[in-house]
Amino acid sequence: TETNWSNYNNFEFASGHQANLNWQSSTSFAEEGKRKSVLQYFDGSLRNRQTVTKDNTTNTTVVAESLYDYQGRPVIQVLPSPTINTIIKLTPNFNNFLNSSAYYKDNYDKILPGNDYCNGAAPALDAGKGGTAQYYSPQNPGKDAGNNKLIPDAKGFPYTETRYLQDNTGRVAAQGGVGPDHRLNSGHETKYFYSGADQSELDALFGTEAGDAPHYFKNMVRDANGQYSVSYLDMHGRTIATALAGDLPASAKLDYLPSKQDSYLTKE
């Protein structure tokens, strides 16, 4: 049964949090009064550009950023890193590329002279201007404090980068990892290949149960170690078969399975 309301008041919000920006707040609560607040800031196209949360242990904020190409596709995901701020808010120009005052799209969505699209990659971030690049570098002012001694040096590449096929399908062509040894064009990026399935391959896999080859797709992925894996998909995008392919990567200290047999197929 509802009882009488003892007290009630009217509250008016005079001004909201950074009212000139697009943002969304999410707060999670746990036992013993624990809570976690995360704010996402969006640009004019409502794409998430910066995510800010708070480290309740150090009472400082942690910032992560996403960068997009001219077609609005997510290209660069910068690792989260702590700041010296104690208030959750947008930090403009938190990450900057070398020789640039801001992260213009031309820094990573532009073909430089002497290169082609397949060999293009984003430059390093400038550790001298702060941000994530400074945190993952010898220029980190707190590098000698406690566990900070174990923070790796990203050498200006504390981000992952995605390259897309130039066919307007939005399919990924390659994806680099964090650090200089796994970035795009390092030889350790993940590459993706797309093709149609061959009828002879389907017959070998499924025998008389195989359908017509035009109804199937064959995709291949080369991981950071150089190992290829193949997936066969039906017209609904469902995976119907997977397999490893190619020779063992030179870096892999493994033996072939006893069942491995080489076979050759000649096509016209």
For the regions a language model picked out, list residue spans one by one.
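Beta-strand elements of repeat-based all-beta scaffolds
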Residues: 1-268
